[in-house]
Structure formats: C-alpha cells, structure tokens
C-alpha cells in the first residue's frame, strides 16, 4: 500500500515536471483535471531553437483536410489560426469558436474580409465570452488540445491527446467556456 502511494506520488511529480512550462501559464485551468489526464497528454513547448513548435504541433493536429466537427477557444487573433481553420472547413463541418470581445474587435479590424466570410457560413457559429480568455483549446474529430499563453499572449506550450479521458476533459473545459458565451448575433453592444 505504501509502495503504491509512493509510485503514484512519483508519477505525479514526474508529470508535473514534464508539464512545468505548460502549467506555468495554464495551471488554473488544470485544477479540475481528472487524475491522470495530464499524464496521458503530449506536450509541446516553445524553445529558443524552435519557438514555433507549439504552433507547428497545432497545425499538424488540425491538418488540411475537412473535418466533421471543430470546437475551439482562442485568446488571440492569428492569421495562421484563421487560415488553418479555413482549410479544414468542409461543406458538412460543424464549427464553433469562442473568443472574447477584445479578440472580436481585433478580428474585425485586422481581417474584415475573413470575418465577413466566416459570418456568412451556415455551419460556423462565432460565440463571444464576456470574460477575457487566457488559454486556448480545440476539440477536432476525436483529438483535444489545450494551449497556454504568456502575459504577452504568446503561445508558450500546448498539450494534446486523443484518449477518451483527455477528449472528455477538454470537451468539459470547452462547455464551461461556451456556457458563459453568447452567439455573436445575440451580443449586446
């Protein structure tokens, strides 16, 4: 019994160490993660010699073929994210994206044509959160991602996985953010 507890403790310490860069910017959203979920996830961090590693991992996960369902949260405006979402949007893709008011305003200013095209798509729902968002997430066709951003909104790390426990946890994070958002059409000025 003591040995089993020690083994669990050791696994927890090893997981926390492996996830330290992610947890430095995303610890709060992980507080309610079910035991063992973080240990099932891959981690990708930015490094001096590979500062875009998390972004590249995101692009690999999203791919470039149409997906069935795409649900995401983003605290930033990114041409790369916009283009990757556009690449996987097919005729039958169900897509939801939650952003905060700041991201909405920056999107409308920086990418007005893309913003209008997205608004015209029947299968795309843009939702606006009242509270400022400080992490990102994505659930796409059985794969889940949570991304961490520093105080300057730079993507520092992401964790991802496709086990049922991981996908379920990230879906619950998504639903918790979504439940506090409204479709853009119902947004009060």
Give each language-model segment a name.
Residues 98-100, 129, 147-148:
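Generic beta-sheet signal
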Residues 11, 15, 176-179:
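Generic secondary-structure signature for well-ordered alpha-helical cores
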Residues 14-65:
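Helix-turn-helix/homeodomain-like alpha-helical modules used for DNA recognition
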Residues 57-115:
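Primarily the HKD phosphodiesterase
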Residues 139-189:
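Amphipathic alpha-helical interface segments
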Residues 1-13:
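Basic, amphipathic "hinge/linker" alpha-helix immediately C-terminal to the N-terminal HTH DNA-binding motif
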Residues 79, 132-134, 153-154:
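Short acidic/glycine-enriched loop/turn segments that link adjacent beta-strands
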């Amino acid at each position: 019994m003591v040995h089993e507890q020690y083994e669990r403790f050791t696994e927890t310490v090893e997981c926390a160490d492996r996830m330290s860069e992610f947890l430095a910017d995303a610890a709060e959203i992980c507080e309610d993660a079910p035991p063992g979920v973080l240990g099932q996830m891959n981690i990708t961090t930015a490094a001096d010699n590979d500062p875009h590693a998390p972004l590249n991992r995101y692009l690999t996960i999203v791919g470039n073929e149409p997906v069935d369902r795409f649900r995401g949260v983003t605290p930033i405006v990114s041409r790369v994210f916009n283009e990757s979402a556009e690449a996987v949007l097919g005729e039958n893709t169900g897509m939801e994206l939650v952003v905060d008011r700041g991201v909405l305003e920056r999107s409308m200013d920086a990418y007005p044509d893309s913003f209008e095209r997205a608004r015209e798509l029947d299968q795309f729902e843009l939702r606006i959160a009242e509270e400022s968002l400080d992490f990102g997430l994505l659930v796409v066709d059985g794969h889940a991602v949570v991304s961490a951003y520093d105080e300057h909104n730079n993507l520092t790390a992401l964790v991802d996985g496709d086990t049922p426990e991981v996908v379920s946890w990230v879906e619950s994070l998504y639903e918790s953010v979504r439940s506090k958002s409204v479709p853009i059409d119902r947004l009060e000025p």
